[in-house]
């Protein structure tokens, strides 16, 4: 939803430029390219939103590229067999201590994948070729973090990029971005996050179970891997997808009464998390 708003603001600016008018969103440039990383298991509405964005981008001259970034497939293959990517699973020790795993999936399967695409495909670098001086911190990477996500706004460790967070600078929260997309573009959006993201509320998994049983089965399979296999290197904690630190199949209605909503013209809209 947040990144979708940022992309559509760029499209709106492109349309304004074609008409000889000033940019509607001065902090948002007309992007050379925007990138969506398909992590292998996305909620159905996410792919529909991406298709909508691609159509808008084609009509406005703002390209949107979809890159395959197989987080889901890699995790299924590697967990319990070799070192797997660190996803922020909820942890629980025998003594009751609770914590979370480090979150490396966004960097490894989104930011780094985009950086490689820019370096190899857009800038034409070859393997082992050193960066040209003009490319050292010579490119902006705009991220669709909303104003409620300021803690995620950090410098980019890649020597090519300077991170920018226009939605944060404009003070736009998730509700603002939803309203913008709905009012200007006519699309009702939900949050974009892989189906097995541990930051989902329990309501999300209940929604999948009732409306997208095939997707729910895939997520349950991951939860069973967390239960049945020992991570490498071994840990002294049990790992869970659910923030309640229960198996998804064991969640009860009371556990799932945690959906988050925001107001849109007097309506309560589920944010998709």
Residue ranges and their predicted role:
Residues 1-273:
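Nucleotide-activated chemistry modules centered on ATP-dependent adenylation/adenylyltransferase
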